[in-house]
């Protein structure tokens, strides 16, 4: 298995004409079983042949796939590959080492049904300043649009596809959405007044017509363990952002509440 720390994620190596016996005796930081090369190469066909070795994260449970493939440069020979799995914990980097915003909580995203849309963690954004600074002079943002558009936030953080937490912030900063999701007036706490409508809109945004609140809530529960969003005890459909949104966004919750004319929620 391709599990040695010195292996790079992906490398391409062109082999010089050598015998198959010499090839099998080579060591790349670790020994590979003889079964790895199922079809011994013929000396006359080695010129221009190459192997690719690749490791990539393929599952939410932090497993890694190692793959070695054989092919011929410019030739018609079909590829063959052998795969192995290994833990990729050692490949991941901590949030503090990736971002200058050391005080921020790790803000990952989650969708157990279509994981390629959701990277396991928020990429470190290279922009200077807060999101508020980032969008201050953007002409497309105006009073008739959300204060925090998900697409703009995704661009600012460099996260790629729009993530659930970004989408929720968009809805929460759009006055036209206050009938089904809104701030309660208590810091970063918010309530899904109509969770089915929130799920429907999330499904529409991600082109997933079968999305419902049960599926969406699984993503929210994933955020519990990551200390991004917590469920408010004793209140139905009430949640709270517990990560450091203020440092990321550049807004304090009271500022957003005032911009959106949020009235304190008196419901128990």
UniProtKB/Swiss-Prot annotation:
The keyword Transcription applies. It comes from the Eukaryota. Residues 131-139 are annotated as: Helix HI-1. Residues 245-249 are annotated as: Helix H4. One of its GO terms (molecular function) is sequence-specific DNA binding. Keywords: Cytoplasm, DNA-binding, Nucleus, Phosphoprotein, Transcription, Transcription regulation. The keyword Transmembrane does not apply. Its main location: nucleus. Pfam families: Ets (PF00178), Ets1_N_flank (PF19525). Autoinhibited by a module composed of four alpha helices (HI-1, HI-2, H4, and H5) that flank the DNA-binding ETS domain, reducing the affinity for DNA. Residues 162-242 bind DNA. Binds DNA as a homodimer; homodimerization is required for transcription activation. Belongs to the ETS family. This is Protein c-ets-1-B. The gene is ets1-b.
């Amino acid at each position: 298995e391709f599990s040695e720390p010195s292996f790079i994620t992906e490398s391409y190596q062109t082999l010089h004409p050598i015998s198959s016996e010499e090839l099998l005796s080579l060591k790349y930081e670790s020994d590979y079983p003889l079964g790895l090369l199922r079809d011994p190469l013929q000396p006359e066909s080695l010129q221009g042949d190459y192997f690719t070795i690749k490791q990539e994260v393929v599952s939410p449970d932090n497993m890694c796939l190692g793959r070695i493939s054989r092919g011929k440069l410019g030739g018609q020979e079909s590829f063959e590959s052998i795969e192995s799995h290994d833990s990729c914990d050692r490949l991941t980097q901590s949030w503090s080492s990736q971002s200058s915003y050391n005080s921020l909580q790790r803000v990952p995203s989650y969708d157990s049904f279509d994981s390629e849309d959701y990277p396991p963690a928020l990429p470190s954004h290279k922009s200077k300043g807060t999101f508020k600074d980032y969008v201050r002079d953007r002409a497309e943002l105006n009073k008739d649009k959300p204060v925090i558009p998900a697409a703009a936030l995704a661009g600012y953080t460099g996260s790629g596809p729009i993530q659930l937490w970004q989408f929720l912030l968009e809805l929460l900063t759009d006055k036209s959405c206050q009938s089904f999701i809104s701030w309660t007036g208590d810091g970063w706490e918010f309530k899904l007044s109509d969770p089915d409508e929130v799920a429907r809109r999330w499904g529409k945004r991600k082109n997933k017509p079968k999305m419902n609140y049960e599926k969406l809530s699984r993503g929210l529960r994933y955020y519990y363990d990551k200390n991004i969003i917590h469920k408010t005890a004793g209140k139905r459909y009430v949640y709270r952002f517990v990560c450091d949104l203020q440092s990321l966004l550049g807004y304090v919750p009271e500022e957003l509440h005032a911009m959106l004319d949020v009235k304190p929620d008196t419901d128990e």
